[in-house]
Amino acid sequence: MTADLLLTHFNQVFCPNDLGHPLFGAEMKEARVLEDGYIAVKDGKILAVGSGEPDASLIGPDTKIQSYEGKIATPGLIDCHTHLVYGGSREHEFAKKLAGVPYLEILAQGGGILSTVRATREASFENLYDKSKKLLDYMLLHGVTTVEAKSGYGLNWETEKRQLDVVGALDRDHEIDLVSTFMAAHAVPPEYKGRSQEYLELIVEEMLPRVKEENLAEFCDIFCEKGVFTADESRYLLSKAKEMGFKLRIHADEIESIGGVDVAAELGATSAEHLMMATDEGIRKMAEAKVIGNLLPATTFSLMEDTYAPARKMLEAGMAITLTTDSNPGSCPTANLQFVMQLGCFMMRLTPVEVLNAVTINAAYSVNRQDKIGSFDTGKQADITILDAKNIDYPLYFFATNLTHQVYKAGKLVVDQGRIV
């Protein structure tokens, strides 16, 4: 079979192993790295990858051939935890952060998430759409081709639905594919202060059924943290969501360890998020339950904390992990996944291969798109990120610079040398 598109002579092509499950523990150390590699694409899907001169059978009279000496290729990068859609911004809290005021104290003062809730409730669909599109454009220019996006800045049905409608519209309109997560349990809204269980009952009885009926989200998430929702409250919400057919996520062990990872393990959550304060016992439980750890080192960086999620302990225990931005207006105002990848090396001591596996094949499993993206297996969508680097180590070593040369989405060139095309 001849290719429509043949990308040749890469210095290296990074090929994650899709073993039929996320890469656990030591499996994350392994990948195929093709020297003088090529990628053949047919009808927007991967036809073949290899080293050296492509087989003549791949080349027909209409095959477009492009050479990439001095470049590397990876599967399209996947940002599997973001709070993409929101109103306003929170630079007015930056001075407090610099002065050492803790995140939960800012929240208790009516700032933090609640500040963004007020701005998001006031924002129109058009305003939220335009703001989120700009973030997606930035992500695409940095090599990202799939993004998970949560609601959670409405905390009422009208605004939560507006956020999810924006995600759905952008999924249709933008080159980046989006995966929706419903997270009305991001905080207790001011009108339910002191009545968190009553608010969760509202979510369970009124919001979740409508989200499912209107097919607005695939995942359900909750913030299990001191001063927000307890482990028992998280168990209540997520068990009800599971009964309705949602896949589960949980923000856990970010600031204190209060049992969120136990809930993740008990309910078979797809992933647990943050995990900076994860204990050895919690890590063991997640490993046994095959819960993916979505790690967000840029949040630790932004909060100016010293404790990063114990990635090496997790791998030694046999967990699967990802790296992702947590892009949001407060605790992590960035949309640069390449920077997050570099933090994975510099602050978590992950190797380049482990990092690249974390943002490709494991991230694909985290968003339930492993059959479509995350590796260069034949038949998967031809999402390809091309970096201006001579080997796979270089973009992790040469930090704080966007090295994206080109991006292909389903075999279509969508980024070319700093421009969206």
Curated annotation (Swiss-Prot):
Its EC number is 3.5.2.7. Fe(3+) binds at residues 81, 83, 251, 326. One of its GO terms (molecular function) is iron ion binding. Zn(2+) binds at residues 81, 83, 251, 326. Pathway: Amino-acid degradation; L-histidine degradation into L-glutamate; N-formimidoyl-L-glutamate from L-histidine: step 3/3. 4-imidazolone-5-propanoate binds at residues 90, 153, 186, 254, 331. Catalyzes the hydrolytic cleavage of the carbon-nitrogen bond in imidazolone-5-propanoate to yield N-formimidoyl-L-glutamate. It is the third step in the universal histidine degradation pathway. This is Imidazolonepropionase. The gene is hutI.
